[in-house]
UniProtKB/Swiss-Prot annotation:
Disulfide bonds: none
Source superkingdom: Bacteria
Alphabetical keyword list: Cell shape, Cell wall biogenesis/degradation, Isomerase, Peptidoglycan synthesis
EC number(s) stated in the UniProt entry for this protein: 5.1.1.3
Enzyme class: isomerase
Source organism of the structure: Paracoccus denitrificans (strain Pd 1222)
Gene3D superfamilies linked: 3.40.50.1860
InterPro entries: Asp/Glu/hydantoin_racemase, Asp/Glu_race, Asp/Glu_racemase_AS_1, Glu_race
Binding-site residues for substrate, renumbered to this chain: 7-8, 39-40, 71-72, 195-196
Active site: 70, 194
Family membership noted in the UniProt record: Belongs to the aspartate/glutamate racemases family.
Isomerase keyword on record: yes
Name of the featured protein: Glutamate racemase
Length: 270
């Protein structure tokens, strides 16, 4: 009954932690592609190939349902995977869906015409690849009208977080927020469009100010997954053991993950 969680590095651990807190009896298999992180600077074909390889590894662990806990993979690869590659008995879900649902206050299956929503000015902070894909703007346009989205590619933030350099990460966040505010001085909401960013959410909130509502993905994704599994229990795979896998050096990744989440995590080689 295991569910797979895939990310290019360690950011997806924020999503896994939220899922585990909400569904403590659900076995989860995490795969971090630390050998190839970060994805945010790669081209779409490269991201597609790496993501498919990661998802196939999780299928081998008995995970028929895999969460792409990586916005770059969700933006650059998911649609193509679902249309051209995915077997009928498997599911791959991205992390954009719950965020769009929360922002537009409508369920993903609601295919009614786009309508006005309360929030009119949205700041999007994401990796360069996610911003370049325009996937967030595209999905939002299907569901809402009259929403102005200003996107800021946040180069360097993921690298700083993966290195454990909180001071550098927070300084970069401040710089990126200031750059966006020069173009959109008064956003009403901010989307943290990378699963690494919840670890520096306080820095985003401080730089944006208390008047801006910051949407962060882990809890939204966990809530959405619980709802999905309630409607599709057949998608629980045969796996029954929680594991942490990495394409990188397990010892090094374990140390960084432990620092990342502030509790011990032991990774194995994928």
């Amino acid at each position: 009954m295991a569910v797979g969680v895939f990310d290019s590095g360690l950011g997806g651990l924020t999503v896994l932690s939220a899922i585990a807190a909400r569904m403590p009896d659900l076995p989860l298999v995490y795969l971090g592609d630390n050998a190839h992180t970060p994805y945010g600077v790669r081209d779409a074909d490269d991201i597609f190939d790496l993501t498919c390889a990661g998802v196939e590894r999780l299928w081998a662990e008995g995970c028929d349902l895999v969460i792409l806990a990586c916005n770059t993979a969700s933006a650059a690869a998911l649609k193509r995977m679902q249309e051209t590659w995915l077997p009928k008995d498997k599911r791959v879900l991205g992390v954009f869906v719950p965020m769009i649902e929360a922002l537009t206050e409508r369920r993903w299956g609601d295919n009614s015409p786009p309508r006005e929503v309360a929030v009119k000015h949205v700041a999007l902070f994401a990796t360069p690849a996610t911003v370049a894909s325009r996937a967030f703007q595209r999905e939002l346009a299907f569901r809402a009208i009259g929403v102005d989205v200003e996107a800021q590619p946040c180069g360097g933030v993921v690298d700083a977080i993966e290195m454990g350099d909180e001071i550098l990460a927070e300084a970069l966040v401040t710089s990126h927020v200031e750059a966006l505010l020069r173009r959109m001085p008064h956003p009403e909401a901010a989307i943290l469009g990378c699963t690494h960013y919840p670890l520096v959410q306080a820095a985003f909130q401080k730089a944006l100010g208390p008047q801006v509502t910051v949407y962060s993905q882990p809890n939204l994704v966990a809530e959405s997954l619980e709802d999905y599994l309630g409607r599709h229990p057949e998608m629980l795979g045969a796996g029954n053991v929680s594991r942490f896998l990495t394409t990188g050096d397990p010892e090094r990744v374990s140390g960084k993950a432990t620092q990342f989440l502030r509790h011990p995590i032991r990774f194995e080689s994928a």
